[in-house]
């Protein structure tokens, strides 16, 4: 096994995290996969359970331990000491989970790690492993919009000085905000790897989570032992949760092209996923549709 006992997922969200968690649970011995932890440990039924959830999220398994709320604020203003304090509190919880489960590898599968907690964890741990879990950006945007999520609950605005990709967001459509978040998270992964302290890293594509060869290659790059991987199916999908199916339509492609016009060419060159990327192919199978590339 790799020297890193702690592996974290860098992901925009709505990208197959539940599916990945199940793959890890089934096929990586000695691994404790945690999906958007810590989750409130609820014991009460019905409406009492809802009240219990609010109480525990406020006072026990808090938004800050999850990576929301004050963590986002601290990241935006560069309060590294606070971020490290929260990360160390999380580490105490994580080590208890490892001890109880008998596992020796903690695999964090959460969109929240790269929203600010990554700064604290990278200071609190000498070495970590990183997995980039990345989905088609337009499908990712569409999936978030179908959920009618509050963007600011889980994200800084593009204007925040703590961002790698800083853009004026005053006239951005909701879809453009999610496209910005996709790009920002992609860049943060690369920044973390370049900064050192990363013992191993790998990438998985959401669309290939049902491809055992692809998944096993990434697990191997992370230095993990695993059993033969078999597809587990798609979990936590929009349709399964009663939302609209995620489809790339003309409006989604138009939103993508508007956003692309905002990107400096120097930034686009840093995002290798977008090299030759053409969301228009998903509309009619037409491979001749243009993808707008900024000129400056």
Language model regions located:
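PAPS-dependent sulfotransferases, especially Golgi type II membrane carbohydrate sulfotransferases
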Residues: 1-7, 174-178, 186, 190-201, ...
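PAPS/PAP-binding and catalytic site of the sulfotransferase fold
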Residues: 16-29, 119-125, 145, 200-227
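Glycine-rich phosphate-binding loop used to anchor ATP phosphates in small-molecule kinases
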Residues: 85-117
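Conserved phosphate-donor/acceptor-positioning beta-strand/loop module used by diverse small-molecule
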Residues: 110-112, 124-147
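Hydrophobic/aromatic beta-strand patches that form the interior of the parallel beta-sheet core
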Residues: 7, 32, 129-131, 202-204
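Short beta->alpha connector loops
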Residues: 110-115, 209, 237-241
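PAPS-dependent sulfotransferase catalytic core
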Residues: 1-89, 283, 288-296
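PAPS-dependent sulfotransferase catalytic domain
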Residues: 85-95, 142-217
């Amino acid at each position: 096994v790799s020297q890193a006992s702690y592996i974290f997922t860098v992901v925009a969200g709505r990208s197959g995290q539940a599916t990945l968690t199940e793959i890890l649970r089934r096929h990586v011995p000695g691994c404790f996969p945690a999906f958007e932890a810590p989750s409130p440990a609820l014991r009460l039924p019905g409406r009492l359970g809802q009240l219990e959830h609010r109480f525990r999220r406020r006072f026990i398994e808090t938004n800050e331990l999850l990576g929301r709320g004050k963590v986002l604020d601290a990241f935006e203003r560069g309060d590294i000491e606070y971020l490290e304090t929260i990360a160390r509190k999380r580490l105490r919880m994580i080590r208890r989970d490892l001890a109880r489960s008998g596992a020796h590898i903690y695999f964090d599968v959460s969109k929240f790690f790269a929203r600010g907690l990554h700064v604290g964890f990278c200071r609190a741990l000498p070495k970590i492993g990183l997995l980039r879990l990345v989905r088609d950006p337009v499908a990712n945007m569409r999936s978030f919009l179908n959920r009618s999520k509050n963007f600011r609950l889980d994200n800084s605005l593009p204007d925040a000085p703590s961002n790698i990709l800083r853009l004026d967001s005053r006239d951005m459509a909701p879809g453009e905000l999610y496209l910005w978040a996709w790009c920002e998270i992609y860049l943060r992964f690369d920044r973390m790897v370049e900064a050192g302290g990363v013992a191993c890293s790998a990438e998985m594509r959401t669309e290939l989570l049902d491809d055992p060869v692809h998944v096993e290659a990434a697990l191997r790059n992370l230095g993990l032992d695993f059993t033969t991987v078999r597809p587990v199916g798609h979990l936590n999908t929009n349709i399964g949760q009663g939302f609209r199916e995620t489809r790339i339509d003309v409006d989604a492609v138009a939103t993508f092209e508007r956003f692309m016009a905002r990107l400096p060419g120097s930034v686009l060159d840093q995002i290798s996923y977008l090299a030759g990327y053409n969301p228009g192919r998903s509309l009619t199978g037409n491979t001749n549709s243009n993808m707008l590339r900024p000129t400056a």
